[in-house]
Amino acid sequence: MHKLNVLVAGSTGYIGIQLIKLLSNHKSVLIKYLCGNTSIGKKISYFDKSLETKKLPNIVKFNISFLKNIDLIFTALPNGKAQEISKHLLKKNVLIDLAADFRLQKAQSYLKWYKQKHRANSKIKDSIYALPELSENKIKKFNII
């Protein structure tokens, strides 16, 4: 069985930890990279002891070179951060942003609601904000969710 190679950016926050718990129990997922900025070199179990028994990589600083080995990127980062990662996506990469970077389909709306300029305008057309349970066929056509 082919496993999806996954990278989690923002792995040490609450959302990142909960996501890692779910992914580490999924038989079709291989977590290749756990990324963070302030906890480089630490084990994820430092932040949540329930992950001690899981075979997971240590936390590393995100590097765009990782993308060539990754199928799926989850970002559990503050608003604005997934936009930067999206600029470097390869055709095979799918980005699932757990923040608000690609919720709105117009850069002007993003500025209005989030009080910051959208820095990946050209990627908005490649994104969809949808519930998988209601939009599975639509979601398959996009590489930013």
Which positions does each model-derived feature cover?
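N-terminal Rossmann-like NAD(P) cofactor-binding subdomain of oxidoreductases
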Residues: 1-144
